[in-house]
């Protein structure tokens, strides 16, 4: 799922700085379906690799950048992700016991069925995004390394218009 998610990153040349006073980094081609697929993959990865950190380093950390990207500043998900991840890493390096042995620690179930279910959902979502992207590339005869792929979608247009 992670490799598929990596391969479906597109629209690099469409990144621009918003014209408002915040000067956010806007990536219009990084739309909701890719963000959800990324979130599912990243949660599955954290849950499978460091399960006892998955509540904070997985769910809470992903929600903290996805909610603003959907409801506050569309198109700025990558910037939100970089900020929240940096803050989280600084905090856990300064207070590592918070996620391991404090009263706020959340232990994962370590249940094989749960691990496989989360992974299967992440894989299915990323396969769906990859198939849709292939469809868009073939239909529009686009180069995913050079072109923005989703310029005909309303979500893309609204992100671009709101920030240019």
Where are these regions (language model features)?
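C-terminal transmembrane-bundle signature of multipass membrane proteins
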Residues: 57-163
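Generic multipass alpha-helical transmembrane bundles of integral membrane proteins
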Residues: 1-76
